[in-house]
Amino acid sequence: MPQPSLSSLYSDHLRTLTARADEALQRGGFEHLVVPSGSTHYQLFDDRDYPYAVNPQFKAWVPLTRVPNSWLVYTPGKRPTVIFYQPFDYWHVVPDAPSGWWVDHCDIHIIRTPEQALALLPKHAERCAILGEPQSTLGAYVPNNPQPVLDYLEYQRAFKTPYELALLRIAQQLAVRGHRAAEAAFRAGQSEFGIHMAYCAAVGQDANDLPYGNIIALNEHGAVLHYTELGQQPPQPLRSFLIDAGASAYGYASDITRTYAADPGSDFQALIDAVDAAQLRMGQNVRAGVDYKQLHIEAHLALMGILKEFGVLTVSPEAALATGVSAAFFPHGLGHLIGLQVHDVAGFAASDRGGRIERPAGHPYLRLTRVLEPGMVVTIEPGVYFIDMLLDEVKKNGHAASVNWQRVEAFKPYGGIRIEDEVVCTDGSAENLTRPVFASA
């Protein structure tokens, strides 16, 4: 069956966004939605700017990620207006004129200076819901970020349109290309820095383009959850490799993690295989009506069951969970929403009018507490780690007998394991966005 083009998907996406904006503006009592793309920020006491990061509320409407000082304006009943900043500048590369599948659906105005936007913005700033950072202020147009508007728009962002799913799939394909190159570099004995460079070259994106800093961790560095140091020399002997790395596609992110053992016959490889199989089952449980908090708790029990089988735990999974021992080995959340942002917004939202669904007691790092609904895209990223700081807490809290410390010492040089896919919640079975791409890569 022929796939719809991005142009037709974008047209439907825009209808969804305008309907959401209509409702959000009505709730907030505003007449216009105004979204600045953001501006460049300069380092303290220097003339060097930080890497530009586009306002997520802006790139939700148009696939533009490198256009500071631009604006999106929507008034109910009218086409969206894009005020596109294209300066006269011989110091830097100037953005190309707008083109692509989206341009026929918006009214586009080119400006040469930021101040020229003033003539194109709605006449009465006080009637505008302006979503942005304080530095985007232009004259009377000061970002006010009205809570009723944000609550509604951010809650609805959890439900991805077919257009958004298409871009998330592209981001998966790019990232998997990088993951394959990174694994090959690891097998060839490269350093963390060398593996990182192989990844970036394969994806065609550098640190300013990637949705987050690559985690390239060899051996015991895999026990640092967000390890980003990139060692210049490969450790000897080379035991393990944990990579958590994504890619960007027109403003949408992927977030994928894999773990590899240098020795395919090692106990660590067997542990990877067990976590991988459990992760796949967890992803299949992403279904409408399922409470993500419960998936997180079930992940703890599954992982502790694996550690029990491998002789790391001496107590039952239930006992490890009840005493907090499980959190020493699996100290983060099972996953999060993903889309325009890696950790997408409204993961705790009780409704589109605000409110908060709290995390379960004893699980302070879970980033998603909502009940799953069709259209949500979540990560499923269970992990098992051997972290000295957390294992010391197990001993201090009187639970040393729950752990076989000899087995812990055997696994510590490998750092840890994390496996992460993106999964779509549908009306039926879960759709894993990541596994099929690896299978065909």
Curated annotation (Swiss-Prot):
HAMAP family: X_Pro_dipeptid (MF_01279). This is Xaa-Pro dipeptidase. Mn(2+) 1 binds at D255, H336, E381, E420. One of its GO terms (molecular function) is phosphoric triester hydrolase activity. It catalyses: Xaa-L-Pro dipeptide + H2O = an L-alpha-amino acid + L-proline. Its cofactor is Mn(2+). Belongs to the peptidase M24B family. Bacterial-type prolidase subfamily. Binds 2 manganese ions per subunit. The keyword Lipid biosynthesis does not apply. It comes from the Bacteria. One of its GO terms (biological process) is proteolysis. NCBIfam families: PRK13607.1. Splits dipeptides with a prolyl residue in the C-terminal position. Gene3D superfamilies: Creatinase/methionine aminopeptidase superfamily (3.90.230.10), Creatinase/prolidase N-terminal domain (3.40.350.10). InterPro entries: Creatin/AminoP/Spt16_N, Creatinase/aminopeptidase-like, PepQ_N, Pept_M24, Peptidase_M24B_aminopep-P_CS, X-Pro_dipept-like, X_Pro_dipept. Keywords: Dipeptidase, Hydrolase, Manganese, Metal-binding, Metalloprotease, Protease. Its EC number is 3.4.13.9. One of its GO terms (cellular component) is cytosol. Mn(2+) 2 binds at D244, D255, E420. Pfam families: PepQ_N, Peptidase_M24.
